[in-house]
């Protein structure tokens, strides 16, 4: 159930997802990155570094992690770290309005600094048009990162060239230098080999901790690995792989996936992939109306992808053939217009009135979905149940969020797979009760789809 264009324009992006503009906040450190030591989704072994009450898992890591490097590997070494510091900034003051991504980078940075490394940190910020723009400089990050690390963060106004070489030459063990926005060079997104070589020229080894851009083959995420060895995953990146890849590869059962959002077309691959592993798939959001129309039901003025009707039929047939329960809502909350203050009514999906549009799932559907989740041991959620940005139509999404928050302490692994569902659990106030909340948007989806992420594939194997 899509946001209006106006609402999208007034929203801001946080950790790969879009949320309504709110006052600046500080996210509890425990909700972001945690060092992950090993990585199989085997419940019989525990990782004690996670918060008490969480399901404990271990995942057999394929890629080498920064945790595999000790003091002997790091002391005095120049370590090029690619993080995701693409934080939202106030348009007028350029003050950071949400520091989640900075906090997520801290465990890796502290580990490197504590082991005597000379850290060269870089990121992208915003969408500069192939050259320096003051509003996209990483300068606002300096003060907050210094505060979180408890030490001075130095900065240079470039990411390659003489000024960087000079700054690196004077860097001491246990110090951090923040390089400028890599996207000030158009060669970054083109994965230009010469640019990658220049980025790598001032370092001895590489750490990628930017999961949000791991699905992009850019110079700072993929190209530099050809010139720096070892090239390893940071703690945040490793944790994302442990949960998102591990959940699909070897889940505790029953395994339930919740897939929401406005369009079937954007979730086709992930639904097909999840059908190979899931016991149940719950479908919500605007995409349900494409399924209903494919069944021959009237959907009023609800969102429908007319060219995906056959696809919806096929997905239901595949689920049946595989013995996977595909659950769609039995009732919906409809509105006479797409507006926060619209007139509403709750109706059966077989009785949607002409001219009305479905914007949330109904109470019967909520109960059905809660029953389906009751015995779940692994849950992956990607996409809201309705237009949760409007309070009238957030009931279904909030109910599902609360249900998952109750499952986690009972031993279930609850994974929020990026995108709007992250904003939804935060809005519901239960983010801290989930096993894992992904910091990636597109990267999360591609990993769940079973795709190879270039930024991960380029890293060294154990």
UniProtKB/Swiss-Prot annotation:
Binding site for CDP: 261, 285, 383, 388
Top-level taxon: Eukaryota
EC nos: 2.7.2.3
Chief localization: plastid
Residues at which Mg(2+) binds: 420
GO cellular component: chloroplast; cytosol
Binding site for ATP: 267, 286, 358, 389, 420-421
GO molecular function ontology, one term from the record: ATP binding
Catalytic reaction(s) noted: (2R)-3-phosphoglycerate + ATP = (2R)-3-phospho-glyceroyl phosphate + ADP
Transit peptide: 1-61
Matching SUPFAM superfamilies: Phosphoglycerate kinase (SSF53748)
Nuclease in keyword set: no
Quaternary structure, from the entry: Monomer.
Protein name: Phosphoglycerate kinase, chloroplastic
Organism annotation: Volvox carteri
Lineage: Eukaryota, Viridiplantae, Chlorophyta, core chlorophytes, Chlorophyceae
